[in-house]
């Protein structure tokens, strides 16, 4: 079979999509208690206010589970967040590579990830096009979490009605009063390893910073389902008596061999459970080969700015700006492709050829959220909203 020459001119096909989310308003019902409660608000409690608008409480008619960092830590050996939470009620998880590293997914009460609203400090994390959640873009993010709340069924979320499946609200670590530094390393099956370095300056003159860098790699259980991921987290805080301002930057870069196709052949399923059809092709001698670079490559960075203010014993406000930028591609070896489908000319009079292509994503997501909380001994009133915009660019590139 003839193929395109290795030095063939690159050709790109682009399409642009723009999404503008509707402005959403959420308004909580009045809640009443039989007796007045003492005001226990302290300066350090402002760190919890940031996510109060999306967190369920004891008196809310919502089924939920709270998970603290101390509960996650013993399990945090390199696997993604869905796998770390698979012991929770009604949670079922899957993993492409077979060992919980790389692409992982979560279902709650049968609802898939597109029906689970995920927020990071109250900021939407779901992909704006598919509504899916790709934790592979945040390697070792569990090391930077302070608390996680999983709400099963209809819940509270800044993302609105899409939360009918479940809501996963994650809060990152807040400021640490004392300076610290830590190094963490773990190794496991299938050549899996995780290396983490973290430090914090401690609180000095109302300022504090903490950061983390991580590397996770694995060969995977499935054939060639390797992963190599880098993640980072940075948090800067200003703490005053009635105010808190925090800036966060976090994200990651991943390269994972594609393993999302599954097995349709019953014989393969019974006798070769690790078989991976990704990248498979037949060479000129009729032998089955696998393309070495059938990989997914993507990086994503998140930036958040939060401001919390306690105006009085009854009024507290929260506001946040956020921006997420991501770009990447997955590479594929394709056999017997029609060159006209790519707007490419015939090669030596032949319109059918093998080729290697990259399918690119280039995304920007930004917006703002706010909430205003009025609370007395018998009343807890919350008003807030969010406005977001998403810009997505898709295009293809023939590289061989």
Indicate residue ranges for each PLM-predicted region.
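N-terminal periplasmic "start-of-domain" segments of outer-membrane beta-barrel proteins
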Residues: 46-78, 105
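Transmembrane beta-barrel wall of Gram-negative outer-membrane proteins
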Residues: 187-217, 222-259, 298, 303-312
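Acidic/polar loop-and-plug regions of large Gram-negative outer-membrane beta-barrel proteins
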Residues: 237, 244-304, 330-357
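Extracytoplasmic beta-strand/coil segments of soluble accessory domains associated
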Residues: 82-124, 146
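Hydrophobic, lipid-facing positions within transmembrane beta-strands of outer-membrane proteins
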Residues: 47, 104, 164-166, 179-181, ...
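Face-selective signature of the C-terminal outer-membrane beta-barrel domain
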Residues: 298-400
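N-terminal periplasmic accessory domains that precede
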Residues: 81-84, 104-107, 119, 135-140, ...
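Short acidic/polar hinge/loop motifs at secondary-structure boundaries
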Residues: 124-152
């Amino acid at each position: 079979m003839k193929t395109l020459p290795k030095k063939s001119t690159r050709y790109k096909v682009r399409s642009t999509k723009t999404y503008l989310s509707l402005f959403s308003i959420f308004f909580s019902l009045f809640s009443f208690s039989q007796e007045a409660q003492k005001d226990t608000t302290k300066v350090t409690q402002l760190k919890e206010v940031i996510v109060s608008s999306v967190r369920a409480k004891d008196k809310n008619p919502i089924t939920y589970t709270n998970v603290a960092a101390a509960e996650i830590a013993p399990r945090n050996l390199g696997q993604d967040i869905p796998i770390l939470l698979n012991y929770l009620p009604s949670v079922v998880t899957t993993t492409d590579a077979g060992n919980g590293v790389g692409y992982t997914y979560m279902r709650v009460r049968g609802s898939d990830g597109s029906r689970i609203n995920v927020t990071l400090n109250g900021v939407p994390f779901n992909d704006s096009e598919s509504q899916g959640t790709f934790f592979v873009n945040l390697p070792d993010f569990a090391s930077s979490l302070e608390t996680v709340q999983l709400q099963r069924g209809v819940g509270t979320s800044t993302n609105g009605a899409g939360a009918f499946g479940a809501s996963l609200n994650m809060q990152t670590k807040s400021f640490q009063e004392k300076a610290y530094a830590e190094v963490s390393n773990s190794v496991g099956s299938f050549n899996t390893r995780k290396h983490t370095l973290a430090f914090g300056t401690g609180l000095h003159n109302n300022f504090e910073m903490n950061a983390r860098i991580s590397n996770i790699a694995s060969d995977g259980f499935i054939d060639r389902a390797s992963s190599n991921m880098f993640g980072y987290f940075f948090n800067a805080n200003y703490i005053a008596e009635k105010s808190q301002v925090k800036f966060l930057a976090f994200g990651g870069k991943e390269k994972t061999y594609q393993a999302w196709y599954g097995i349709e052949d019953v014989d393969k399923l019974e006798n070769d459970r690790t078989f991976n059809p990704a990248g498979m092709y037949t060479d000129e001698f009729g032998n089955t080969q696998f393309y070495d670079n059938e990989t997914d490559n993507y990086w994503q960075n998140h930036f958040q700015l939060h401001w919390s203010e306690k105006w009085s014993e009854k009024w507290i406000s929260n506001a946040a700006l956020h921006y997420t930028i991501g770009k990447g591609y997955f590479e594929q070896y394709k056999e017997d492709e029609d060159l006209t489908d790519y707007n490419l000319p015939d090669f030596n009079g032949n319109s059918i050829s093998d080729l290697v292509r990259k399918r690119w994503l280039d995304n920007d997501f930004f917006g703002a959220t706010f909430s205003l909380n009025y609370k007395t001994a018998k009343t807890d009133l919350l008003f807030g909203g969010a406005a977001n915009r998403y810009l997505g660019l898709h295009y293809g590139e023939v590289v061989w």
